[in-house]
Amino acid sequence: MFLNEKVGAVIVAAGQSRRMEGQDKIFALLAGKPVLAHTLSVFQESPQVDDIALVMAEHNIEKAKELVKEYNFSKVIAICSGGTLRQDSVRSGLSALCDCGWILIHDGARPLLEPDSIPEGLEAAKLCGSAIAAVPLKDTIKEISPEGLVEKTLPRERLISVQTPQVFRADIIQKAYQRVGIIATDDAQLVEKLKLPVRIFSGACANIKITTPEDLLMAEILLKKGR
């Protein structure tokens, strides 16, 4: 609960694992436990989170049901089928959390989320209705032409690297996802299209997204070091 309203989490785990060299990143073992189990554990154990909607690729739904049962993830109230785009998958998860006042959206392939990020995200979202986890950029970012030539260097001090969770008042994110014909790379971008403010709160460098075998190895190292 947060501000006397239910809090729901959409865990998006319907990706194709194209860069994992044949492994399914969601069920790959991390310290002897599936990546997805690490991710769900953070939300299961969070005192703020009431309900979880888990979004899976169609072919992984039965396997997800087995995992939820094995680890007793009692807050998972729905296992939904994902869509072609990430947006379609999130929309599917949102439909299962209709009675929640606040929504967190998190990548299932980010297993090293710090538990404190959940209340911190909710507190940040309370100020304007939307908030996203982010970390400062470490590298210089340049804009290039279609021919691969550098056109300009972007001001790093005004740029951030965005992570999940992304946190929203439910009415805002539901309205954002009702719009069609807009392709976005993250949830906050749809809120931005509504001309509504989005705050940032501190993410963590350890909150990596597993997309390659090298990421999985790095997650193992971070986990052993206590992140």
Swiss-Prot record:
Substrates-to-products reaction catalysed: 2-C-methyl-D-erythritol 4-phosphate + CTP + H(+) = 4-CDP-2-C-methyl-D-erythritol + diphosphate
Keywords: Isoprene biosynthesis, Nucleotidyltransferase, Transferase
An example Gene Ontology biological process: isopentenyl diphosphate biosynthetic process, methylerythritol 4-phosphate pathway
GO molecular function, a single term: 2-C-methyl-D-erythritol 4-phosphate cytidylyltransferase activity
SUPFAM superfamilies (UniProt xref): Nucleotide-diphospho-sugar transferases
Site (Positions MEP for the nucleophilic attack): R156, K209
Entry superkingdom: Bacteria
Presence of keyword Transport: no
UniProt keyword Nucleotidyltransferase, yes or no: yes
Role, per record: Catalyzes the formation of 4-diphosphocytidyl-2-C-methyl-D-erythritol from CTP and 2-C-methyl-D-erythritol 4-phosphate (MEP).
UniProt cross-references to NCBIfam families, sorted A to Z: ispD, PRK00155.2-3
Similarity section: Belongs to the IspD/TarI cytidylyltransferase family. IspD subfamily.
Name used for this protein in its record: 2-C-methyl-D-erythritol 4-phosphate cytidylyltransferase
Gene name linked to the record: ispD
